[in-house]
Amino acid sequence: MEVNILAFIATALFILVPTAFLLIIYVKTVSKND
């Protein structure tokens, strides 16, 4: 089970990090348009 938990955490970080980065760029772009 420990391996599955670690894999879940690694996958979550792998997805959340780029997503958060894209969201920050998107928010900055929208703010500039306003």
Curated annotation (Swiss-Prot):
GO terms for biological process: photosynthesis, light reaction. It is found in: Plastid, Chloroplast thylakoid membrane. It holds the Pfam family PsbM. The chain crosses the membrane at residues 5-25. Keywords: Chloroplast, Membrane, Photosynthesis, Photosystem II, Plastid, Reaction center, Thylakoid, Transmembrane, Transmembrane helix. Its main location: plastid. It is a single-pass membrane protein. GO terms for cellular component: chloroplast thylakoid membrane; photosystem II. Belongs to the PsbM family. One of the components of the core complex of photosystem II (PSII). PSII is a light-driven water:plastoquinone oxidoreductase that uses light energy to abstract electrons from H(2)O, generating O(2) and a proton gradient subsequently used for ATP formation. It consists of a core antenna complex that captures photons, and an electron transfer chain that converts photonic excitation into a charge separation. This subunit is found at the monomer-monomer interface. PSII is composed of 1 copy each of membrane proteins PsbA, PsbB, PsbC, PsbD, PsbE, PsbF, PsbH, PsbI, PsbJ, PsbK, PsbL, PsbM, PsbT, PsbX, PsbY, PsbZ, Psb30/Ycf12, at least 3 peripheral proteins of the oxygen-evolving complex and a large number of cofactors. It forms dimeric complexes. This is Photosystem II reaction center protein M.
